[in-house]
């Protein structure tokens, strides 16, 4: 046996291995003693002890955790726990770059829109620069949907997230404006990437995806109001799509015209109506700080947006206007004909908007993912939501949207857990239908555990499955960290039976109050078996149950 090597004789790789082993030893000891541990502190100290300038990667630490400690330690090591705090791993994918569909009849794209084949960022999709994290992943995979999915799922796994349930977001301009052949190829590959099967068409891909171990619980597609007509909605139902993100940007007709949107505000209201009657969840993209609006008019449009039954979306993505090189807005800004709000005024505005959000709406995002160096004017802070919430605290207002109150997010940010849970019901009218928002909440601490969106379809419903007295469940979601579909973790809120209880109440309301003979559910492809257990059967793209 040779002498043990001195620290100075060891290679960098050997030192890194010793550092990782030491970090894990400290984590195991802390776990055995029931102590909380600051991982960053441990990594910094241990790296310094072994004379390393760089810290070990989280992926390598997770990979080295001994099998019998994985269950206890990996959740504590998870990078970006918010990624799966809502119970689902979100995988964003991008379709190939293509021109905006309304160029052909308005002659140009929207004044604020970067990206696209004709822009300074020519390898990027419309409305993206190619430097956002999702864009960069898509470009690396040459916009191949299969590779984008496999790489992202693998990445989330390595970071310690459960990828048992996946929701896709299809980004990159107006997907529904692309040729049908390409759309089918794209969606087919998303499903195949999860199931491992090679399908010949979308129907076959969906059939195999239903039985896959990694469940596709939903697909979200970004679209425009003029590409959200009956034929588009029917195609999207066939894909397994459950949520739409519709670019609204402004509720003012003059602003839509001046910014060259290429559609009217009336088209927005009609698309909301058609989409909700088909069972989709509707998320609106809105842009405060557009040209010729001003602060007061901006606040008024959001009051209108949440209170007027012609709008009332289920979700909101708030994208304050950014000035980016190569856009029409950049030229206006350069010549002094457009000026962005000051950073402080923008935080004020976002705080006022968040205070208006009703408890049934979820605010998904508060700013774009565009890297700051590409922004000539507009948002100057990367943490706009946090700043706005802090400003609301000062103003004595609070944000009561779905995301702020979710049990998983509350646990990460405030370490609070629900104590007394009760069923809460809120009814409202939106887009020609009667909406009921059912939720399990802890009203004392204002924490949301699960929600269900029930709608009595309007007589104008165009889907044959939903005609003649049918109610539809547009969303059922129990929040809390992802629990693999087959396991029950008593400390996590998914799989505790809240979903079943919400469905029972929805069936009662549909039968006794709506007078409906059937209840339909727009279900993600991978969750259809969950509804089969409750007596639902597949009818077209919906899971349906007779109530009498």
From Swiss-Prot:
| Reactions performed catalytically | uridine(34) in tRNA + acetyl-CoA + S-adenosyl-L-methionine + H2O = 5-(carboxymethyl)uridine(34) in tRNA + 5'-deoxyadenosine + L-methionine + CoA + 2 H(+)
Where is the N-acetyltransferase domain positioned along the sequence?
397-548
Where in the numbering of this chain does the Radical SAM core domain appear?
A: 83-373
Please name the GO terms of the biological process aspect recorded for this protein, alphabetically: axonogenesis; regulation of transcription by RNA polymerase II; somite development; tRNA wobble base 5-methoxycarbonylmethyl-2-thiouridinylation; tRNA wobble uridine modification
Give the knockout phenotype.
Answer: Morpholino knockdown in embryos results in reduced tRNA modification with decreased levels of mcm5s2U (5-methoxycarbonylmethyl-2-thiouridine). Morphant larvae display a ventrally curved body where somites present a distortion of their typical chevron shape, being rounded with a different angle compared to controls. Morphants also show disruption of the horizontal myoseptum, diminished somite area, disorganised muscle fibers, a small neural tube and reduced Shh signaling activity.
For this protein, what does the record note about how its cofactor is bound? Binds 1 [4Fe-4S] cluster. The cluster is coordinated with 3 cysteines and an exchangeable S-adenosyl-L-methionine.
**Record family assignment:** Belongs to the ELP3 family.
Protein's UniProt name: Elongator complex protein 3
Q: Which organism is it from?
A: Danio rerio
